C-alpha cells in the first residue's frame, strides 16, 4: 500500500503462461506457500534474463504456530518451493535453517498471562549503509533463513547482529528455547562483538 503512489502494482498469476510477465518491470514474490511449476519457473527465469527485477521474500521452512502454542514445540518442515533451486543458479543459496539473534522482538507466551519470551527467532534486522535501508527503522523478520552467496560481488541490505547464530537444518522450534540462555547477558556465540557473526537474511 505504501508503494501505490509511486508505482503501478498488480497481482499476477503466471499459470504456465510464457508471456504472463511481459508487461511488468519488476516481480515481487511474497511468502509463497506452494511449489512453483517448471513452467512458472521458466517464465520467471526468462523475465529475469530479459532484464526484469526480481524480489523474493520467502522462507524455505514451514513452522506451525498453533502447534507451537499448544505443545510448546513444533517440527519445522521443508516447503520445497522449488524457487530456491532457481535462485541457487543465480548465486543465492537459501539454507533450510533458522537464524537466532539476541537483537530480536519478544514473543507473547500464551501459556502464561502477560508473559513475554526472548524470542530469538524473530530477528530485528541490523540495517546496512545501503541506500535502500539506511533511513528506515529495523525490520522484524520471524523464522528467517540464512542466505549464502557464491558471488563475492554482493552488497547485503539486511543482516543479523553480531550476537547471532544459526540452527541446524529443519530444526525443532521450542518456546522454552529462550530459557537456555542467560536473560541478563545472553550470548548466542562466544564472541558476540565479532562482525563475522553477522548473517545475511
What are the residue ranges of the model-derived segments?
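Acidic, S/T/G-rich, low-cysteine, solvent-exposed domains in lumenal/extracellular/periplasmic regions
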Residues: 1-201
Amino acid at each position: 500500500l505504501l508503494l501505490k503512489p509511486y508505482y503501478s502494482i498488480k497481482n499476477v498469476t503466471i499459470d504456465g503462461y510464457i508471456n504472463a510477465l511481459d508487461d511488468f518491470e519488476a516481480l515481487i514474490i511474497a511468502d509463497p506457500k506452494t511449489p512453483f511449476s517448471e513452467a512458472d519457473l521458466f517464465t520467471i527465469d526468462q523475465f529475469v534474463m530479459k532484464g526484469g527485477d526480481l524480489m523474493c521474500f520467502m522462507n524455505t521452512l514451514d513452522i506451525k504456530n498453533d502447534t507451537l502454542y499448544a505443545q510448546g514445540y513444533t517440527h519445522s518442515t521443508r516447503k520445497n518451493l522449488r524457487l530456491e533451486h532457481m535462485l541457487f543458479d543465480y548465486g543465492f543459496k537459501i539454507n533450510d535453517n533458522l537464524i537466532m539473534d539476541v537483537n530480536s522482538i519478544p514473543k507473547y507466551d500464551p501459556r502464561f498471562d502477560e508473559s513475554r519470551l526472548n524470542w530469538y527467532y524473530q530477528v530485528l534486522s541490523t540495517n546496512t549503509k545501503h541506500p535502500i535501508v539506511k533511513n528506515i527503522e529495523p525490520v522484524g523478520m520471524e523464522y528467517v533463513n540464512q542466505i549464502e552467496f557464491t558471488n563475492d560481488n554482493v552488497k547485503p541490505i539486511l543482516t543479523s547482529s553480531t550476537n547471532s547464530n544459526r540452527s541446524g537444518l529443519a530444526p525443532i522450534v521450542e518456546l522454552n528455547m529462550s530459557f537456555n540462555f542467560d536473560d541478563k547477558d545472553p550470548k548466542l556465540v562466544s564472541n558476540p562483538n565479532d562482525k563475522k557473526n553477522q548473517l545475511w537474511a
